[in-house]
Structures are given as C-alpha cells and as structure tokens.
C-alpha cells in the first residue's frame, strides 16, 4: 500500500465527520437528519440534542423553566428545597401535559442584600443574585428555548419572593416575541402550593399557626412528599430544636408534617397548574 493511502483515508474520514457539524439554528445537520428514538425523560438535561430535536418536531413544543432558589428553610429542611421541589413538580406537570419538556432548574434567585445581609441572607447557605441578573438569566434561557423551536415557554416559580417579577418578565417577552412564541407565568402554581394547599389542611383540622408561611407544617409536608431526604425528620421531634422566626421558621410549626399530607398539596399543584397552562394555550 502506498504510504500516502493511510493519510488519504484519514483525511476522507475527517471530511465526512465535518459534515455533521451543526449549521446555524433552524437548519438540519448533514449526516444527522434521521430521527433517533426519543428518550422517555421529560427533563431536557437527560436528552441528547437529537432526542430533543425530534421531540420538538413530534410536538413537544412547550418548555417549562422551573425556578427555585437556594435558601434557609428552618432547622429541618435542606437549603435546596425549592430546587428539588420545583424540578419534581415540573416533571409531573410536563407528564400530564404530554407536550412539554423541563429545562434545568434556575437555582439562583434574589434572596436579599449582602451588605448588610437582609431577609434569608442572614442565614448561612442562602445564595442571592441581583434582580437584574435574575431577569437577564431568565430572558436568556427563554430565548434559547425559543430559537430551538419551543412555542410555549412556561415559568414556574416555587418561591413567593419573585412571583411579580416573573409575571412582569413574561408580559414583556410576550410583547417582544408574539405571535410566534407565547410566554406564561401561571400564578396558579404558587397559589396552589400556598393558599390552595393551606385551605385543604385547614379543612382537615390543622391550625393556621401550624401551617406557617415558611418552613412550617405546609412547607415541610410538601417537601416530605417530594423527597423525604429533603427533611431531617429526626429533628422534628428532637428536644431543644426551636421552630421560630429566629431559627428560620415563620409563623408555623412543622412537627405534625407528613408525606401523606404533602401528597394532597402535590395533587392540588399539578391539577391546578396543568389546567391553567392548557387554558392559556387555547386562547
């Protein structure tokens, strides 16, 4: 064999591989146009780019952007509560919708100032970003999903502090991207997780001073239902553990929290949010 032949074969192989480099968005990749089997996961980060491409082509054109937050939640709930909860609930909602995929969780949100520390920033482990950074991050994520073919983009926020900010952002993006892309920030998600779930618990005899607004019975039960590892259950009844404002629990008492109660909240959140998204998609 000629000494130049191995080099020629290698060059040909390299040229063929370069045909599969992606052209600008919207054009098909040469050598990669054949459909691949779609992954079963609704989470974008679990898919290959080709699985995602084919899922969008097959009609999964709704993208959910779950927004959490890394903050203190009293002595017994982990710092990543909001992130774990919104990811899991978004997955349930996407499965119910049947046409949705879930983007990675936005775990960094405004949590107060750093100098001096305010709000949850007074507790070690809480992470904060300025509102402008939060706004720009959400805008960039939504824009990325838009250019990849998603036509409905849904912000779901698990934390009460930024609900109005996200609603204003959705309104602004709708004005910019209509009619090709619709951006939703359904308030039903947070309303169901707070007011709706609280009403369910009150009807079952639980007191308002147990439910709380942060890290109380309501918050703890939801976390137990999503993943028991989010809660240090042994601390709920340990002697000497204080569940008060000074220790990050606001107006509540988590000691009677259970996963069974939390599942009532989960069902309420999923049902109300799915109905809200479907209603807005039909407008």
Feature-to-residue mapping (PLM):
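Selective for proline/serine-rich intrinsically disordered segments
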Residues: 4, 21-22, 33, 64
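Residue-level detector of alpha-helical hydrophobic segments embedded in or interacting with membranes
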Residues: 1, 18-19, 30, 61
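Bacterial N-terminal signal peptides that target proteins for export
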Residues: 1-11
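Compositionally biased, low-structure terminal segments
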Residues: 8, 22-23, 30, 191
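Bacterial N-terminal signal peptides
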Residues: 10-24
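Extended, histidine- and acidic-residue-enriched regions that form the cofactor-binding/catalytic faces
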Residues: 28-154, 158-283
């Amino acid at each position: 064999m000629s000494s130049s032949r191995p080099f020629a074969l290698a060059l040909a192989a390299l040229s063929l591989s370069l045909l599969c480099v992606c052209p600008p968005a919207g054009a098909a990749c040469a050598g990669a146009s054949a459909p691949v089997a779609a992954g079963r996961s609704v989470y974008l980060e679990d898919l290959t780019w080709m699985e995602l491409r084919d899922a969008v082509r097959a009609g999964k054109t709704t993208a959910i952007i779950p927004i959490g937050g890394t903050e203190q939640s009293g002595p017994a709930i982990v710092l990543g509560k909001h992130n774990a909860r919104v990811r899991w609930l978004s997955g349930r909602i996407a499965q119910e919708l049947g046409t949705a995929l879930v983007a990675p969780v936005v775990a960094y949100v405004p949590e107060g100032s750093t100098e001096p520390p305010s709000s949850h920033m007074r507790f070690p482990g809480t992470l904060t970003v300025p509102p402008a950074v939060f706004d720009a991050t959400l805008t960039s994520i939504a824009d990325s999903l838009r250019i990849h073919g998603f036509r409905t983009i849904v912000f779901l926020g698990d934390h009460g502090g930024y609900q109005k900010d996200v609603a204003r952002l959705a309104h602004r993006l709708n004005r910019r991207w209509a009619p090709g892309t619709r951006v939703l920030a359904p308030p039903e998600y947070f309303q169901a997780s707070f007011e709706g779930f609280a009403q369910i618990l009150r009807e079952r005899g639980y007191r308002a001073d147990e439910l709380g607004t942060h890290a109380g019975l309501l918050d703890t039960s939801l976390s137990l239902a999503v993943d028991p590892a989010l809660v240090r259950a042994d601390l709920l009844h340990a002697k000497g553990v204080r569940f008060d404002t000074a220790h990050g629990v606001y107006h509540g008492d988590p000691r009677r929290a259970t996963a069974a109660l939390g599942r009532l909240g989960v069902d309420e959140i999923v049902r109300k949010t799915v109905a809200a998204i479907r209603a807005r998609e039909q407008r």
